[in-house]
Amino acid sequence: MGIAQPGELAPVPRFRHLPFTIPNGIGRDTYLKIHNVMNHLGRAVLVGQHRRLIQALSSDLGVDSLVAMVSISMQDSEVCSAFSVYLTTLEQAYHWPRESTLSTPEQLEDHKLVIQMLQQPELRDTLVASVHAQYDHSATPAQVALSALSIAKQMIDQATETRSNKTKLPTEIQDLVNLLYRTSRGDWFIQGNYTDPDSHKEFGRLHEVIRTNGTQRSVQEIFQRFNGISWLQRMPLLHQNFASNSSILCAAYADLQVAMALARDELFSMVIDEPIWGLTFAKFSKGVGLCTIGAGGADCPMFRMMDALCGRADNINQAALLDELDFRSRFFPPGMRALINDLVTAPSVRSHISSGEASYELTQAFRAMEQIRYDLYEMHRKKAMRIALALRAGQQATSSGVQNATTPEKYIASTLSAAIKVRFGQEPARPQVDAFAWSTPLLCSDTGVIQTSRIQFVFSTPLAVSPGDSLRVAVEVEQGDWHIRTYSITHAYARQGSSKARDQICQAVGSAEICVRSKGQVSSFLCNQKTGFPVRVMIKPAPHFRIAGNTSPHEETLFVAQGGAVCVFLAWLAWQKQLVGTYRLVVGARNYNMLAYVGQLEKISSSFGSHLIVHVVLSRPGHGDIQRFVPGNIKASTGRVTHHLGLFSSCSTKATYVCGSASFALDVVRCLSQGPGTKREVPKVSRLQPIVTSRLPHFRLHVAAATENGTDKPCLNQITKLELALHNSPGDLWIALGDRVFDISQVPSFHPGGEKVLMYRAGRQAQDVFDTVHEGCYMISSLLNEMVIGRLDSARGEFSQWEDYLDKIVEIQNDLTNHSRIEQAPTGSIEQLAESPPVEILRGATNCFVKGWSSLLQQSGIGDSGVVSLLSSHQDAISALDAHVRMVYENDFEDPVRYANALRKIFDAHSRLVCGIHTAIDELKRHIVERLVEGDEPELTSLHISTARISQQLRETSKSY
């Protein structure tokens, strides 16, 4: 293994290769024992019998293996790193799922403590000093092992004593204890990313674990690969003289923009099943023993390094900033902590700019970099809102105390918003940069009136742009009257002399274009300017629309554009040197004269041969319009785009990207999802229908922004809360936002946040959750304007308590739906088994449901008999499940085929249970709604009957095991 420079990632151990490099002997045998247990750990975790596997390993370890491990680890740092990953992982796994306080098996703990004394530089320094003091000659591996274990145990005894005395250890001692109890989450630095099959094996290849852990390294690797670390290593010296180094710093800040933007896109693509994540990784990653550090947030060192470089918005003194960063980077390797310390103690660029002494160019370059950093934190804030779903799955604790909040969503939103204000100030939109704009007519009417124009912007400093991004433009329409609008970037021009890697989809550009229709005050102003004019701009990235491209010759990607929106695809194609597989570009326009960018379209159509197929569909073609296209390169036809899409999409289509108005985009989604000409009906689907949670949706939409009040439609039908409550199943999703009701059944097919976030509030009021993520987003308003179906009648009836009960029932049912829909439920295939979630997920789903239903029964005041029966039936089902999985482990663990089939039967039994519960709930909901609509109070016996049916379902499930 190589040696990492300050701030750089340490090399990844070659876990599978190491047995071939370790000399024969006890050390190699010990490594192979642990390596084999790691390979089987995920399979044992599936049925919750991992502790038996780990106990068997621990009983097979001893003094000889400890000394041998020390011997080979002292000779090879790569072996030491591998042992560190494996032993910390096994300790964390032993304590999962955190139902009670346990002690790590003795020999496993001893081996883990000793390897940490060798692996962690701070602990190693303590060990070396002790060994040198005890032995005049070179210490033997046995002496080193004994000293390491003795020092570690002394630290633990000291920590135990202070805890029993209700006092605290000195900070420097507690930091060393924290390193002794370093979690496997802390070892992601020396594990590969999620594509490495030998890393992050705590739960086999469970997506929620490998992506959460592995993305941390992949994000940091991207930041490092695109010069982020190399520039930060130079920053402390460059900041010593801002005046002399201003031009170098401007170039550095531009490169840091690109590095952060590419890392942000990788982080955005990290999607998970939140309930599964909450019951697996979130519980697994908590500290054990006397460690004072919990799991913490999911931010990698890039966040903290950029915090150190950019400082706080309030220019707080550097000592306070250093203390904060030191606290947040306690688990980082020493080299990363050293770089952070160097950055934060160097002269502050923010202070230099605030003093008024910075050059104009440096000020603009810093603002541009802050734009990307701000968006990075905004994206992190929105993704963190999904923690609420994980909490509902039964996670009982978080390091930040979110679970104790009355409203977790508001707690998370306020906490992260405060963090953003600390970094960017009270007005985070402030980091705009100056630009100069020119308007050029693109399309005119027969009378010469400008209908569409190209607006070109020259930026005062390079901005990081990817195809599909938008530009937030502030323009002074009248003296002192500034208006802000957001437009899609149609073309971007790289700065002179810049270069990019083959797979790089982001560049620092010096100028960009937008295409604007002459409608509305600001757009009309932009279109009709005769001379250049100053503006202020800010990039609005669109990571949800990032075009990934094909990776195989057999893959296809479909682009669908409406009119001038084709420019987004043309911009991406212009940046490609070659294409892999097939790309189909379908463009719709009224006629040839209304087809914007026709010249570029014709040019690009002949640039990639058979890899790019262009179709133009004209809805109202003029005479000779079809014949004007060059034969062979562009295929032209008449009609509506949706009438032709069935010919262009195939089962090999990897993803479909749609650009245009909201109505156009939704028509395309509807057409490709259901087939052209199909009338939309509420589908009869199971609440357990398949769901994809491991990747972004197939459809990626980039729609034109609407006005702020675009969803205010007249003559909307009145929809009661009772009717709303009946639409909370997959394929039939309604939500209320304020006083309006929306049918969002199509949204899961393109929602970047996944379907479970939508199901969370299906059939209920969702304004509070919506505002924390999408407030003020005009693009979302455009889509909602096409989905509004009525106005919510919020008047409370005579039996208002039953309306509250109904809302609670919907909430409970939504949780049950979310917790029971699993992408990789066992199928009986041994190849798929490693990606399946553990049986603990099923236990968590029923626990959450029973807890919620019991609360409903107590709230309704129907007596304790129903609650007692429900709890008793549930306990019987859990006990039967526990006994069954123990038997499966004992009888089938060594036979993967039988094991896979046994797991499938367990999950099938759970599916039958959930279907039965949903049937009972649906009938109860209909009864309540029918009675309330008729003006009668529902009978409490209906709750008794439903509860009895649910209890019976639980008892039948117990027998099925």
Swiss-Prot record:
Residues covered by the FAD-binding FR-type domain: 429-548
Record-listed E.C. numbers: 1.-.-.-
Biological-process GO terms, alphabetical: L-tryptophan catabolic process to kynurenine
Binding site for NADP(+): 453-456, 499-500, 753
Pathway: Secondary metabolite biosynthesis
Pfam families cross-referenced by the UniProt entry: Cyt-b5
Entry annotated with the keyword NAD: yes
Biotechnology annotation for this entry: Apicidin F, like the other known apicidins, is a cyclic tetrapeptides with anti-malarial properties via histone deacetylase inhibitory activity.
Gene Ontology molecular function: cytochrome-b5 reductase activity, acting on NAD(P)H; heme binding; metal ion binding
Sites where the protein binds FAD: 298, 753-755
Record's keyword terms, sorted: FAD, Flavoprotein, Heme, Iron, Metal-binding, NAD, NADP, Oxidoreductase
Keyword flag NADP: yes
Top EC class, one word: oxidoreductase
Cofactor(s) for this UniProt protein: FAD
Domain Cytochrome b5 heme-binding: 716-793
Cited SMART domains: Cyt-b5
Upregulating conditions: Expression is positively regulated by the apicidin F cluster-specific transcription factor apf2 that binds to the eight-base-pair motif 5'-TGACGTGA-3' called the 'Api-box' that is found in all promoters of the apicidin F cluster except in the promoter region of apf2 itself.
GO cellular component: cytoplasm
SUPFAM superfamilies xref list: Cytochrome b5-like heme/steroid binding domain, Ferredoxin reductase-like, C-terminal NADP-linked domain, Indolic compounds 2,3-dioxygenase-like, Riboflavin synthase domain-like
Physiological role: Cytochrome b5-like reductase; part of the gene cluster that mediates the biosynthesis of the cyclic tetrapeptide apicidin F (APF). The non-ribosomal peptide synthetase apf1 incorporates four different amino acids to produce apicidin F: L-phenylalanine, D-pipecolic acid (D-pip), N-methoxy-L-tryptophan and L-2-aminooctanedioic acid. L-Phenylalanine is the only proteinogenic amino acid directly used by apf1. The 3 other apf1 substrates are non-proteinogenic and have to be modified by other enzymes of the cluster.
Family named by the database record: Belongs to the flavoprotein pyridine nucleotide cytochrome reductase family.
Name recorded for this polypeptide: Cytochrome b5-like reductase apf12
Record organism: Gibberella fujikuroi (strain CBS 195.34 / IMI 58289 / NRRL A-6831) (Bakanae and foot rot disease fungus)
Organism lineage: Eukaryota, Fungi, Dikarya, Ascomycota, Pezizomycotina
Gene name as annotated: apf12
